[in-house]
């Protein structure tokens, strides 16, 4: 799977966050999400002191729950990175300017989702049954995190993704819940909290 990191081709940009940019990429006729994030040279050594490595640590553990979280396929530290992070918010201007001087970035490849809940709720009117399914799926993801002693610490409408499905139900522990056309998952784990951190 590490070939994905080296041989994927960028199709288009699909998202911009405070510190990273998300692209749709293609490898071996399959689509993935690639997150590129600039880091300082003192963040290049893996350590859960830094948010980027916390995100990778969290994603690796939660990859066994691909319906509730994004599966990470690979990650790669890049030297001489030419990525330019767009300014997402004036609040982050100083940090982005500081990072723009760095020559390092991290590239992570995740499974791709169809979109984020913010856009889904803006473009479609979800029924009460769809909202019930959304809440049940989100609570189950929170339960899984609690079971592994994690807190997401950054849940909002841009960090909840969805995937359209023809499956009628999704298994949440011992029960099956109707999907009503969508499977929801948490994304963006850079602020994850764990006792190990």
Feature annotation, model-predicted:
Residues 124-153, 157-158:
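Conserved kinase catalytic-core helix
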Residues 146-163, 167-177:
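Catalytic-loop of the protein kinase fold
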Residues 70-128:
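Conserved structural core of kinase catalytic domains
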Residues 194-197:
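Active-site Asp-x-Gly
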Residues 21-81:
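ATP-binding glycine-rich loop module of kinase domains
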Residues 2-28:
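ATP-binding glycine-rich phosphate-binding loop
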Residues 187-192:
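Activation of the activation-loop gatekeeper triad in protein kinase-fold domains
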């Amino acid at each position: 799977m590490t070939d994905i990191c080296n041989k994927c081709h960028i199709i288009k940009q699909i998202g911009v966050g405070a510190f990273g940019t998300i692209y749709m990429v293609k490898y071996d006729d399959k689509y993935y999400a690639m997150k590129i994030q600039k880091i300082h040279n003192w963040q290049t050594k893996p350590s859960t002191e830094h948010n980027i490595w916390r995100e990778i640590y969290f994603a690796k553990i939660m990859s066994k729950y691909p319906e509730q979280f994004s599966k990470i396929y690979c990650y790669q530290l890049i030297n001489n990175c030419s990525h330019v992070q767009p300014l997402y918010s004036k609040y982050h201007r100083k940090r982005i300017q500081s990072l723009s001087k760095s020559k390092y970035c991290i590239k992570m490849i995740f499974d791709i989702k169809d979109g984020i809940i913010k856009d889904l709720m803006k473009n479609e009117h979800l029924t009460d049954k769809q909202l019930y399914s959304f809440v049940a799926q989100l609570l189950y993801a929170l339960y899984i995190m609690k079971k592994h002693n994690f807190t997401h610490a950054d849940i909002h409408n841009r960090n909840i993704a969805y995937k359209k499905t023809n499956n009628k139900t999704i298994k949440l522990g011992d029960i099956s819940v109707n999907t009503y056309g969508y499977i929801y998952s948490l994304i963006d784990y850079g602020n994850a909290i764990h006792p190990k951190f």
